[in-house]
From Swiss-Prot:
GO biological process: maturation of LSU-rRNA from tricistronic rRNA transcript (SSU-rRNA, 5.8S rRNA, LSU-rRNA); translation
Keyword Lipoprotein recorded: no
Entry-linked InterPro entries: Ribosomal_uL29 (IPR001854), Ribosomal_uL29_CS (IPR018254), Ribosomal_uL29_euk (IPR045059), Ribosomal_uL29_sf (IPR036049)
Name of the protein in its database record: Large ribosomal subunit protein uL29
GO MF: mRNA binding; structural constituent of ribosome
Pfam families, per the entry: Ribosomal_L29
Keywords assigned by UniProt, alphabetized: Cytoplasm, Ribonucleoprotein, Ribosomal protein
Compartments in which it is found: Cytoplasm
Length: 123
C-alpha cells in the first residue's frame, strides 16, 4: 500500500476508516512475518510506511470524534475536562470578569462619597 495522506482520510466515514485500519494492521503483521523469515529489503522498508499510515488513520479517527464532541457540548453548561481550554491551574481558578467587578455595599458607598479628585495644572 502506498503512503496514505491525512487529507484523503478526512472525507471518509468511520466505518471506512476502521476497515482501512484493519487492512493496514493485517499488512503490518504480514510484513513482520516476512521480516522474520528473511524477506526482501523492499518489504522491510515498507514496515515504517505502514506503521505511520496506521498512526494517521488513528489520528484522523480521534480528531473527528473530538470535533463531534465539541459540537455536541457547545452551549452546554458543563463540558468534559479534555474539551475545556488547557490553562494553568491559577488561570482556571481566577475570578471571571463579572466576579472581579463586584463591590460590597461599603465599598460602593465609599466610592460614591470619596470620588477621585481631578486637578487641573496651570501652564
Amino acid at each position: 500500500m502506498a503512503k496514505i495522506k491525512a487529507r484523503d482520510l478526512r472525507g471518509k466515514k468511520k466505518e471506512e476508516l476502521l476497515k482501512q485500519l484493519d487492512d493496514l494492521k493485517n499488512e503490518l503483521s504480514q510484513l513482520r512475518v516476512a521480516k522474520v523469515t528473511g524477506g526482501a529489503a523492499s518489504k522491510l522498508s515498507k514496515i515504517r510506511v505502514v506503521r505511520k499510515s496506521i498512526a494517521r488513520v488513528l489520528t484522523v479517527i480521534t480528531q473527528t470524534q473530538k470535533e463531534n464532541l465539541r459540537k455536541f457540548y457547545k452551549g452546554k453548561k458543563y463540558k468534559p475536562l479534555d474539551l475545556r481550554p488547557k490553562k494553568t491551574r491559577a488561570l482556571r481558578r481566577r475570578l471571571n470578569k463579572h466576579e472581579e467587578s463586584l463591590r460590597t455595599k461599603k465599598q460602593q458607598r465609599k466610592d460614591l462619597l470619596y470620588s477621585i479628585r481631578k486637578f487641573a495644572v496651570k501652564a
